[in-house]
């Protein structure tokens, strides 16, 4: 839904609404600094008006979470989706949300149909009930800059499950989630099933026992639709890889090319914050294509290239540079296009000369493998993911990368010729993990929203209140290891849960 339906609300927060200025800074420079507002217990009340205003005026909202763990990885990849849902529910009931990222994107029609004002928040949370925290999750989060001392000292307290009395008027994370529902904006996530289950259990109500009831509840909670950027990247945009950092950087690069060519492109603006808030603002830098050129002497880490995660972390001797990975993928794709053109030319030549050798005999080299079609390979890769041999990233959804994605990337690599192999060596980075510091719920939410906005732009689709934003991605949630998504719909055999009905009365009875 477009944000301009709230004409009575000022477009940008004012200093009185949480200390945010009306001035904005364009994000069209070579190095874009994305301001992420850190929200903790000591400034939650101060930032509260800005949070509400950002939600109410947003065209869509992207959400991301950092979790204390995920439980048994193998159960999370169960082929039975109902059993998989139960496994995620168990994790949500026993683990907690450590931080919540919100990125509110507001369309600015007066500055162009593809112009957005982005406001990004990173909320540090502390569940007041007992919960499990997994050592691997702690290790992963600490490697990426998560401060557990700050979380325990300044985390915003919350409780899980159903409400305890009337909480609708309090300034709490649970009330904030209710305001997100009241906003009736499209909700955007990345690999969103686990996020949705954790959000429901931690900030909304006790989870329903079956998946059908859960999806029925979601339909009423988010009538403008739920969008999953991992599904959009893998099945709609057809990116070689679909983990978040790859999809974001790919969209950034393509958007930069369109801007340079004078074609329609995304234009972002961010709020300018006063110096008094400098202690609560964390600026994250995004590099435009061509701004960062390193000497390239080491190889690319295959595991990071495929999954966006490497078990060696910062100690990995190979490159985790996303730009190098994308450069290599694009070189492989160009090589495949050249092969295809040669094959078509040879086919036309053979057709014009009856009696000559067949096409199969004329092909120089083995046939290209089919991508994502080998069921045996799929099964093997799923088993590897389940056993933690690949992509077992703790505390994050991104580790559960589909076997299809890995098979795709391996097949692409096998098609590279000698020239492409040389490119792999020559384009490696001396800086092994340049992107590792980016991983945070707030910035991840921003990247998620950016990917969705770009995919919509690339398809020539615009947000409107009367119909789904991207029909092919509307209410489709990515399922690891599956070729079909989870469709969020209300079945004639499923009714919304009682706890959900009570929350709906609370949401709309007091609005």
Swiss-Prot record:
List the protein's name.
Target of EGR1 protein 1
Query: Residues bearing N-acetylalanine?
Result: 2
PROSITE patterns in the cross-refs = ZF_C3H1
PANTHER family, A to Z:
POLY A -SPECIFIC RIBONUCLEASE/TARGET OF EGR1, MEMBER 1, TARGET OF EGR1 PROTEIN 1
Q: What is the lineage of its organism?
A: Eukaryota, Metazoa, Chordata, Craniata, Vertebrata
Short sequence motif Nuclear localization signal: positions: 336-348
Q: Disulfide connectivity?
A: none
Chief site of localization: nucleus
Species annotation: Mus musculus (Mouse)
Q: Which gene encodes it?
A: Toe1
């Amino acid at each position: 839904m477009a944000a301009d339906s709230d004409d009575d609300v000022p477009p940008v927060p004012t200093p009185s609404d949480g200390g945010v200025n009306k001035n904005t800074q364009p994000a069209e420079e070579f190095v874009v600094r994305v301001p992420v507002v850190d929200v903790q217990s000591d400034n939650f009340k101060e930032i509260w008006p800005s949070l509400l205003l950002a939600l109410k005026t947003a065209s869509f909202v992207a959400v991301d979470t950092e979790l204390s763990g995920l439980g048994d990885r193998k159960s999370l990849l169960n082929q039975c989706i109902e059993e998989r849902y139960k496994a995620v529910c168990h994790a949500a009931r026993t683990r907690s949300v450590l931080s919540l990222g919100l990125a509110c994107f507001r369309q600015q029609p007066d500055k162009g149909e593809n112009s957005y004002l982005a406001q990004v928040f990173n909320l540090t949370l502390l569940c007041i009930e007992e919960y499990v925290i997994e050592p691997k999750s702690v290790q992963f989060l600490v490697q990426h800059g998560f401060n557990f001392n700050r979380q325990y000292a300044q985390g915003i307290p919350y409780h899980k499950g159903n409400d305890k009395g009337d909480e609708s008027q309090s300034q709490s994370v649970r009330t904030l989630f209710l305001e997100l529902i009241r906003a009736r904006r499209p909700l955007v996530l990345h690999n969103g099933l686990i996020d949705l289950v954790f959000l429901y259990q931690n900030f909304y109500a006790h989870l329903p026992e079956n998946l059908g009831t859960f999806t029925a509840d979601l339909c009423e909670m988010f009538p403008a639709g739920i969008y999953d950027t991992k599904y959009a990247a893998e099945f709609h945009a057809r990116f070689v890889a679909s983990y978040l950092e790859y999809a974001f950087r790919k969209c950034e690069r393509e958007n930069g090319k369109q801007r340079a060519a004078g074609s329609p492109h995304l234009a972002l603006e961010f709020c300018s914050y006063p110096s008094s808030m400098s202690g609560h603002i964390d600026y994250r830098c995004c590099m435009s294509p061509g701004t960062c050129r390193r000497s390239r002497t080491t190889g690319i880490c295959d595991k990071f290239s495929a999954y966006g995660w490497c078990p060696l972390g910062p100690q990995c001797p190979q490159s985790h540079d996303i730009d190098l990975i994308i450069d290599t993928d694009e070189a492989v794709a160009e090589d495949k296009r050249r092969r295809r053109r040669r094959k078509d030319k040879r086919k036309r030549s053979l057709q014009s000369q009856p009696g000559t050798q067949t096409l199969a005999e004329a092909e120089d080299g083995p046939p290209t493998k089919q991508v994502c079609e080998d069921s045996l390979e799929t099964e093997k890769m799923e088993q590897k993911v389940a056993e933690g041999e690949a992509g077992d990233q703790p505390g994050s959804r991104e580790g559960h990368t589909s076997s299809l994605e890995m098979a795709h990337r391996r097949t692409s690599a096998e098609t590279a010729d000698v020239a492409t192999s040389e490119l792999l060596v020559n384009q490696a980075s001396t800086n092994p993990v340049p992107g590792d510091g980016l991983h945070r719920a707030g910035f991840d939410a921003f990247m998620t929203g950016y990917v969705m906005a770009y995919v919509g732009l690339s398809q020539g689709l615009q947000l409107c209140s009367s119909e789904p934003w991207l029909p092919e991605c509307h209410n489709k949630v990515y399922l690891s290891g599956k070729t079909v998504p989870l469709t969020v719909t209300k079945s004639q055999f499923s009714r919304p849960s009682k706890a959900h009905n009570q929350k709906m009365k609370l949401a709309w009875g007091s609005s």
